């Protein structure tokens, strides 16, 4: 079996706010919730591919993240990029704007922005050209 992505996990100090962002702004449906001892969620899994075979895991964190510029030169995960169709790009840009999410960088193929906790996210149609 060839290697394939299973999931990406992002730690969130405000899990509910992050879940709302990924569900309401990006339209990712909830696959599963993992409860936390004492109530609430420890983790929320969101489908990225519509089939549930690739997902984004939002994990509860204990402290808020430090603000980071778009490129900070530090090693580690730089961004999570999600695939869109080239013909959908303008609609996605409008959706982000309507939700108050600023696009911080653009290329020919990709829109870059931050989630509520400063994680870098991209919507890309690379290498598809429209």
Regions found by a protein language model. Name each.
Residues 44-46:
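Short acidic loop-to-beta-strand element that houses the catalytic metal-binding Asp/Glu
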Residues 41-42, 115:
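Short Asp/Glu-rich motifs
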């Amino acid at each position: 079996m060839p290697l394939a992505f299973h999931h990406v996990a992002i730690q969130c100090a405000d899990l509910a706010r992050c879940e709302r962002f990924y569900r309401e702004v990006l339209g990712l449906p909830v696959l599963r919730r993992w409860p936390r001892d004492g109530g609430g969620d420890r983790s929320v899994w969101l489908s990225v591919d519509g089939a549930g075979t690739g997902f984004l895991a939002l994990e509860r964190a204990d402290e808020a993240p430090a603000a980071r510029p778009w490129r900070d030169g530090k090693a580690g995960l730089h961004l999570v990029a999600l695939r869109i169709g080239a013909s959908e790009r303008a609609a996605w840009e409008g959706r982000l704007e309507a939700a108050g999410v600023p696009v911080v960088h653009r290329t020919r193929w990709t829109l870059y922005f931050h989630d509520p906790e400063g994680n870098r996210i991209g919507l890309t149609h690379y290498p598809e050209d429209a």
